[in-house]
Amino acid sequence: MLNNSADTRRPWLAHYPPGVPDQIDEHSRETIADVLRHADTAFANRPAAESFGVRLTYGELMKTAEEVTTGLQRLGLQKGDRVALMMPNVMAYPAIMFGVLLGGFVVVNINPLYTARELTHQMNDSGARVLFVLENFAHTVQEALEELNAEMAVIVKPGDLIGFKGGIVNFVSRYIKRNVKPYKLPATLPFSNFLFFAKQGKFTPVEIGPDDMAFLQYTGGTTGRAKGAILLHRNIIANVNQCQAWLRSFAGERDDHVMVTALPLYHILALTACCLFVAKLGGCQILIPNPRDFPAFVKTIKKTRMTMIVVVNTLANALASRDDFKQVDFSQLSFAISGGMATQAAVAKKWKQVTGRPLIEGYGLSETSPVACVNRLDIEEFTGGVGYPVSSTDISIRNDKGEEVAIGETGEICIKGPQVMAGYWQQPEETAKSFTSDGYFRTGDVGLIAEDGLVRIADRIKDMILVSGFNVYPNEVEDVLAQHPNVAEAAVIGVPDQHSGEAVRAFVVSRDGRTMDDEEMRVWCREKLTGYKVPRQIETRASLPKTPVGKILRRELRDEVMRG
């Protein structure tokens, strides 16, 4: 059904792009395995992915995925068993991921930069039987070995699946860049040997349904012990279809999309919005194994005709500040999506100046597969909001009593839609606490729905600072600090104060490397913020703690301050 409603409770429907339905088919029987099968049938000779300048077609991707399935079946795995992937964006990742899903197994994505403790928790909590790990991180597996319950590790190399050039890539990684620390692991198999082992068997098709589990996507690691969000095939397919409906209104049926996948595929945003979305379109994704290697990153995208890119605020800021990035040909760039953390107006302005395209902010969480909101793709300027709820998605703003507040009023953002997770893995109490009595997922984010239907985020509830009874949202203060011409990055936290309960404290990274004048910065803030929001102290740092995706870790700054 196309939107033509003047729905006062859902004002966003009146602002949908032409042709975008207010509902998708929520009863589709399609699975992620079907996405790959369709791509193999319809786009067999099209490039599916590119790594280190070498491309893999959809036909080749399907063939390798079936071999991965066969290998796991020969190891004795059954439908529903969990398989962990611990690697960055290398060619083997999509092949292994699709292979796991084709077999009816469940993908457990693990951040390759995790410590042995974090790896052990996620492996044992999920019950993963097999781990595919890039050899660069095998030493972490060795450290965790005594505590791990997994049966086997398959060792992947960065050059796997890219032919002759792969040998060169592997040699450079191991012997020139020395990226591989020594390790010794029992019960391991090189990925190339695993594929040879698989070829000795026969692929057995598995019946997969929309209510089967696809991913255990762990979340909450920046605020506490990570818990696994259960994402079913229907959750992910719904989100991919929601994204496709939004794109179709803007780009029609264009069939030559090239997505630059710079965010790691173990992160839900890149997984859905880059890898799976692009497979549905029959496009090609350019895999960036290390987006922090900016010279190599920019060199790669200079050689591509990118039409789409997904970034986080810190990555957009770093790229737009580089002279070599300013030399990239952006003439084919249709849009750039920003998500994963708050996008700052100063960064969006700089991005537009460099690329000629606005940053289009979206919003979501691991628990929502992840896209819940996105701005229209035809905007000319950054809106400052996170967009409109996508098709079949309802957002309700609730007060601390669980009551829905009026349009324009602030409260907790609660989401209902087919992309919302089934619950947390083996944590019924956490699951129950995370949903309202009428079935909305409680995000823990504070925001509002404006009169025009645009959703605006204030901050995380747990990050909100209470100064003399007044709410201060770190995002707002960080945005003001980031507008200063010499501030590259900013982070704001609350610290205990005997007079006001809490006080605002800021940390900044300067562009020129010099220490920022504390009073000068407070004057800057006073011009743009009411008094209780102005930081009591502003400290210059060489860098700020971040997750591998680039999200600033306020918790680490708070912990450091509390330790004294």
Regions found by a protein language model. Give the residues of each.
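AMP-dependent adenylate-forming
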Residues: 10-17, 34-57
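Conserved AMP-binding/adenylate-forming core of the ANL superfamily
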Residues: 28, 45-90, 94-98, 115-120
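A short helix-loop-beta submotif of the ANL/AMP-binding
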Residues: 46, 82, 88-116, 124-130, ...
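Conserved adenylate-forming
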Residues: 72-77, 198-211, 216-261, 283
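AMP-binding/adenylate-forming catalytic core of the ANL superfamily
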Residues: 114, 131-135, 309, 401, ...
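ANL superfamily adenylate-forming
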Residues: 142-210
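Conserved AMP-binding/adenylation subdomain of ANL enzymes
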Residues: 237-258, 268-308, 322
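Gly/Ser/Thr-rich phosphate-binding loop
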Residues: 303-310, 320-381, 394
